C-alpha cells in the first residue's frame, strides 16, 4: 500500500507492506509531492510536485522499486491531474503550457515526453481537466468546472480532436461531475444536481441519451466515487450532515448497500486494487488524522468483509482518548431557518466560554474531522467550540447553498447573531464570554 505522509519537513511517498507494518520511504525530495496515481497493471507511479511553493506543478514518473524518476513536463508551466489510460502507456493531464494562463488538456506517452500533444485548448478562463480514458484509449472524458453550481462534461476524440458536450447545458446551470466510462464505453457515470436538491450519482447512455438516476433516494450529496477495475461494482461516499457514509454499488442492477463497519468520521481516497478484490480508503475521525484502510470485497458486488487498518498516524504524544466528540445540533435563525452546527465541549459544572469558528468559502462546510486546534481550545482554554454551517454552506442542498447570494449575503451574518441568541439559552455556555474566529470568508464574517 502506497501512502503519502510527512515525517520530516514535507510529505513524501512511503510503502507499507503489511497492516500496521513499518513504512519504507520511497521518495526523498526537498519539496512535498502532490497527487499520486499508480500505473494500471504496472509498477510505475505518476506524481506531481512543484518547486518553492510556486504552484507550477510538474508531472514525474517514478519507479518505486529503485527510486528512479523522470520529469515528464517542461519544468516551467503549471500541470496537474494525470490520468492513466487503461493499458498504462499514456497519461492525460491539464497544463497551461500554451500561454501560461489557460488550462488545456494534453496527452503523452509515458515513455516519450516529446510525444505530448494538446487535445483540447481551453476557450475561456474556466478550469478544464481529464477525468478518464475510454477502454480503447481513443477518447478522453473531460471536466469543465465553471463554478460550484455550474459544471459540464465533454468527450474528445484523441485523433481528430473533435469535442462533444455530453453533460450540462450552457443555458441552464447544473452540477455535472464526470466520473468515468463504463466497461463497454457505452455510457458514463457522473454526479449531478439536475434532478433534485442534492448531488446524485447517475449514469448516461451515450447513444440513446437515457439517464438513470441511481441515488435519488439518498437526500444528501454524493461526494466520492470509484469504479472497480473489472467494472462489476463501484463504491461511493455520501456526505450525510457532515459525516461520511460508504456504499457499494452493483453496476448491473444499480442496487447499492451501505458499508456498516466504517468508523464515524470522514471517508476519502476510495480506490480499488487491480484485482478488484479490495477497496482502499482513508478515514479521518475526531480522534485520528487520516489513516489508510482496506475493505475486503467478496464475490457478490454488494458483499464485503473485514475492514483493515494499515496505518496509525502519530499525533505528537497527544492523548486522543481525551478528545471530545463533536455533537451535531441545529438552531433557528432570524427567519426560522434551521442552521446546523457542531459543538465541541467537555462536561462542566460551570458555564463554559465559547469560541465560534466560521469556515471559509463561502460555500465551504465545517465537518467533524480531526482538529488538534479545536481540542486544544477545549482542553487548555476550557472553552466550548461551535462550528456553524451558516446559509450558503455546501452539503445541505442547492437551495441552502444559494441563500446568501447577492443582497442576501448579510443574512448569513445574521445566522451568527442567531447563534449568539442560542448560546444565551444554553445553561452550560457562558454568553458573556464569546470569541469569534475565522479566515478567508470566515474572516469577513468575523
Predicted regions and their residues:
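Blade-terminus and WD-like Trp-Asp/Gly-His loop motifs, strongest in beta-propeller folds
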Residues: 1, 36-44, 82-90, 131-140, ...
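Serine-hydrolase catalytic core recognition
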Residues: 268-446
